[in-house]
Amino acid sequence: MKLNLYVLTPKRIIWDCEVKEIILSTNSGQIGVLPNHAPINTAVDMGPLRIRLLNDQWLTAVLWSGFARIVNNEIIILGNDAELGSDIDPEEAQQALEIAEANLSKAEGTKELVEAKLALRRARIRVEAVNWIPPSN
């Protein structure tokens, strides 16, 4: 059996194809979705989206929050923004992480601290996405 996966943002369609499985970051943790999954509507948290293609190859995307609906082997993810893992430059992601860590240590005041923590979280997620090693089949 297959799942129809659609990942949409206000700017573009990120994904539109059949897949075997996904692992999705939600506000209550990561969930795995296989064919015939129970219907669910859930908030999507900032984090990785793991996609297992029909040929068993795994791909990674990064979702920057949104909403997901899973019903009748169809997954529709409406994201505020998203990036494909293949579009993320590993060196640039690592550099952004180092800058975010430095900015957090220099942050003063509540607003700066919140912004620095958010930037650090985003940078960590991007680094995690490009460094992820898929499970062996």
Swiss-Prot record:
Key words, A-Z: ATP synthesis, CF(1), Chloroplast, Hydrogen ion transport, Ion transport, Membrane, Plastid, Thylakoid, Transport
CDD domains on file: F1-ATPase_delta (cd12152)
Database matches in InterPro entries: ATP_synth_F1_dsu/esu, ATP_synth_F1_dsu/esu_N, ATP_synth_F1_esu_C, ATPsynth_dsu/esu_N
Pfam families listed in its UniProt record: ATP-synt_DE (PF00401), ATP-synt_DE_N (PF02823)
Localisation per UniProt entry: Plastid, Chloroplast thylakoid membrane
Topology of the protein relative to the lipid bilayer: Peripheral membrane protein
One biological process term in Gene Ontology: proton motive force-driven ATP synthesis
An MF annotation (GO) of this entry: proton-transporting ATP synthase activity, rotational mechanism
GO cellular component, one term: proton-transporting ATP synthase complex
Subunit record text: F-type ATPases have 2 components, CF(1) - the catalytic core - and CF(0) - the membrane proton channel. CF(1) has five subunits: alpha(3), beta(3), gamma(1), delta(1), epsilon(1). CF(0) has three main subunits: a, b and c.
Protein family according to the UniProt entry: Belongs to the ATPase epsilon chain family.
UniProt function note: Produces ATP from ADP in the presence of a proton gradient across the membrane.
Listed name of the protein: ATP synthase epsilon chain, chloroplastic
